[in-house]
Amino acid sequence: VLSQVDSSVGGKTAINSPHGKNLIGAFYQPSLVLADLGSLATLDPREFRAGYAEVAKYGVIDDEPFFHWLEKNHADVFARGDGLTHAIATSCRSKASIVARDETEQGDRALLNLGHTFGHAFEALTHYDTPRLNHGEGVAIGMACALRFSAYLGYCASDDAARVEAHLKSVGLPSRIRNISNWNFTAEQILDAMYQDKKVERGALTFILARGIGQSFIAKGVSGEMVLSFLKDELGR
């Protein structure tokens, strides 16, 4: 699911480095992408959920009606019913639309990184140990954190953050840092990892935040002190 709705669309080819995730790469568009939904019939349930985190992300970015549809139809998606086709097709169209207007991520394409500033930091600190935390789980926790951080900063209602968290939990995805197995890192360590994010510009943090579900935006120059305060609050929950 993850590859069908995310990495197969957009032409990014990247690898991790000791300094962070996806920091070395290029853009190379394929001639054709085929998504065989039949191959998902044998996908491990945990991996299916991980891919679903990216599906839900598209609704949170700029498509509240799709997010609402997922809230009502996620059981059919997980049962590999007709809803799965709709979910994957909608996700691909959503990403393709954003990529078409900003292929090399000079602007709006960064919206696709919703949840990833947090999520990549969690993955880096756990040394990309996928049995402990896979990418989709990191994105799920990161997306929930991004909505709570948006509410913390006064950009969106806490009800929106709670709604996203509730949906992630309803499909079995983690939504809190404490859900990561054997987590023993401090807020300061998380913040340090965030400064390795590819969206950092001139030493300043960039986050994808939201004014509501379906209303995400790029927030540049976010105060490290505000992030640290929020992370300490999160770790205390």
At which residue positions do the language-model features occur?
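Short glycine- and Lys/Arg-enriched binding-loop motifs that mark or flank ligand-binding interfaces
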Residues: 2-7, 16, 111, 115, ...
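C-terminal charged capping/lid subdomain of soluble metabolic enzymes
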Residues: 53-55, 155-237
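A generic hydrophobic-helix recognition signal that picks specific residues
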Residues: 22, 29, 108-109, 205
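Active-site segments that bind and position negatively charged phosphate/pyrophosphate groups
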Residues: 68, 72-188
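Short beta-strand segments
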Residues: 27, 34-35, 113, 208-210
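A glycine/threonine-rich phosphate-anchoring loop and its flanking beta-alpha core
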Residues: 1-75
